[in-house]
């Protein structure tokens, strides 16, 4: 149960997995839960932070993979950090947000720090008319879009011309 005395899948999962959380991880999880985000976005950000999405690098730990290259840019090993920050397709998605955001402006060397920087963005990241909540929601939408594109390529064998497709206007929230 969470603080309001109501049972939820999220609170049960949090309780059953509490032994795995570090103090810093607990703080991030608390910050995610305090945001006005759909649970799907919360879980996506949490999975990215903990590097537990089934990326090529993650799957290769469990079984031998034919390739672990990023399916979007095919230039580096597919990790959460690469897929959501360093991949050229991800950079284009971030920049096309309507705010012209450069994801490189977030100082993150791992996926946990990336999500931490999104949930608690540094002052230089937020613009005058953009609240923290708007920024986090935009970031969650962009990451969800990147994950969806990735899954279309990997799971549905779709051939996507990333230079020809317009990215969504994520600033309309």
Tell where the protein language model's regions lie, with residue ranges:
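Charged boundary/loop elements
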Residues: 1-173
